[in-house]
Regions:
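PRPP-associated nucleotide enzymes
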Residues: 1-164
Length: 164
């Protein structure tokens, strides 16, 4: 595990939960940055390095461990990994629902934040106007999301259902 890539974590927002999930991801990003700063401060003191030298060294180790050929410039500051997994929710004219993963989830621990009793009008693909969804509709979106995540190779799936 690297100090700049500490966990393989992904967060999915259910339909209508984008605002709440955005707040959670913002908090997680702050925790990642705080953790990196604490670890990097301890390592720079212990090894007599500057923070820039440490970031360069850790990036080198990550590049050596990676199977991909590194491209682009060397990072000058720590950037928190993007934890949000984008999903496109679609509702068809016959009432069927579909969840389509936009971002890859292979090997990630995925957290799905979903509110099955949300009674606010929700805009999803396939609908012209925002529509109030029933609990059954929300459950079907949840089931199709879990199914898509498992088929895409996620390491684990955890449901966060704030209502119940």
């Amino acid at each position: 595990m690297s100090i700049i890539k500490p966990h393989k974590l992904g967060v999915i927002a259910g339909p209508g939960r984008e605002y709440f999930t955005g707040k959670e991801v913002k908090h997680l990003r702050r925790l990642y940055i705080d953790r990196y700063e604490k670890v990097s401060d301890a390592l720079t003191r212990r090894h007599g390095m500057t923070s820039e030298e440490l970031l360069k060294f850790v990036t080198l180790v990550d590049d050596l461990d990676s199977r991909k050929i590194p491209v682009g410039k060397l990072p000058s500051t720590f950037h928190c990994p993007d934890l949000t997994i984008n999903v496109k929710y679609t509702r068809f004219a016959n009432g069927e629902e579909k969840a389509e993963l936009i971002d890859p989830v292979r090997g990630l621990s995925v957290y799905i934040i979903h509110d099955v009793s949300n009674s606010a009008p929700i805009k999803v693909a396939g609908l012209d106007e925002p529509q109030v969804m029933s609990v059954n509709d929300h459950l079907m979106f949840l089931f199709t999301t879990v199914h898509a995540v498992k088929l895409a190779g996620a390491e684990s799936v955890t449901l966060v259902l704030p209502t119940y």
